[in-house]
Amino acid sequence: MTQANTNNAYGKDIAMTVIGAGSYGTSLAISLARNGANVILWGHEPEHMARLEADRANHEFLPGIDFPESLIIESDLEKAVQASRDLLVVVPSHVFGIVLNSCKPFLREDSRICWATKGLEPETGRLLKEVAFDIIGDSYSLAVLSGPTFAKELAMGMPTAISVASPDSAFVADLQEKIHCSKTFRVYANNDFIGMQLGGAVKNVIAIGAGMSDGIGFGANARTALITRGLAEMSRLGAALGAQPETFMGMAGLGDLVLTCTDNQSRNRRFGLALGQGKDVDTAQEEIGQVVEGYRNTKEVWMLSQRMGVEMPIVDQIYQVLYQGKDARLAAQDLLARDKKAEGK
């Protein structure tokens, strides 16, 4: 376990600093603080953070859920980063590198960085670990937290399970100790750092496809087939990158995929529903009102599949709908019209 350290601006031991005060970052911070730990929640908009402190709640994203007393609201990045050895970065994937670069000058010698961001680097499709290495080098321990979690349910204290992976086994053990709550939040250790990062990105894309299928009106049979074949595409890409096959049958693979494809709490699924009902991309995004990670993830995953030479027909058709203006019904027809294949291919 990490030793207590009260030598910071707050005069108390800070178990973790959460970077990102959106719905998921806030819910993770709430869950950590409910374990009795002192937790900092940092956000980049001072006015928003002032509202959170005044209300002691995030009414915009998590209405009706009060903050624990041990949750500290902060808009000063230097103070937040310096206060805790362990950072949990929870920001959209397209700003992950920007935020990490902002944190870099304030990192401690013993800092360890975990992220719950799901996605790849914009325009390149690189894994976030590669982005992190480019920015901060290889002297810091890195970890990824991923699995089937809706922010509201987590913040409400409803039962949830998730996985954490890192090349540093001691960091994994510490994260399990800090995050795990035997009553509501179970944290599994995983040693597949690559697969854990990939699952969260690909499932967002497949969830858009599941929503499109339902929006068109294809029903449960088609949705289930799409989820199953989407899992096959995820596994093929993972194999090409050196991931472990069993990872995609776990929390960060099948678990997150099923959750995101079948429940309308998922923005990616709702985005796909709107597209399937004939709405254009801009209108569909406006209806959601929050970041739809799967929109950017689709381009990132498509680029990665092209670079690795991995066939991903579902991802390819969703990419054509989002970025080339293809009609969702035509995309579905083209998927069904593909040459006959063995299921394992």
Curated annotation (Swiss-Prot):
Keyword field? Cytoplasm, Lipid biosynthesis, Lipid metabolism, NAD, NADP, Nucleotide-binding, Oxidoreductase, Phospholipid biosynthesis, Phospholipid metabolism
Could you tell me which HAMAP family the record lists for this protein?
A: NAD_Glyc3P_dehydrog (MF_00394)
> Which family does the entry's similarity section mention?
Belongs to the NAD-dependent glycerol-3-phosphate dehydrogenase family.
Q: Which biological pathway? A: Membrane lipid metabolism; glycerophospholipid metabolism
Q: Which residues bind sn-glycerol 3-phosphate?
A: K118, G147, T149, K203, D256, S266, R267, N268
Reactions listed under catalytic activity: sn-glycerol 3-phosphate + NAD(+) = dihydroxyacetone phosphate + NADH + H(+); sn-glycerol 3-phosphate + NADP(+) = dihydroxyacetone phosphate + NADPH + H(+)
Native organism taxonomy: Bacteria, Pseudomonadati, Pseudomonadota, Gammaproteobacteria, Vibrionales
Q: List the GO terms this entry assigns under cellular component, sorted alphabetically.
A: cytosol
Q: What is its EC number?
A: 1.1.1.94
Gene that encodes it: gpsA
Its main localization is cytoplasm
Function of the molecule? Catalyzes the reduction of the glycolytic intermediate dihydroxyacetone phosphate (DHAP) to sn-glycerol 3-phosphate (G3P), the key precursor for phospholipid synthesis.
Its name, as the record gives it, is Glycerol-3-phosphate dehydrogenase [NAD(P)+]
| Organism of provenance | Vibrio campbellii (strain ATCC BAA-1116)
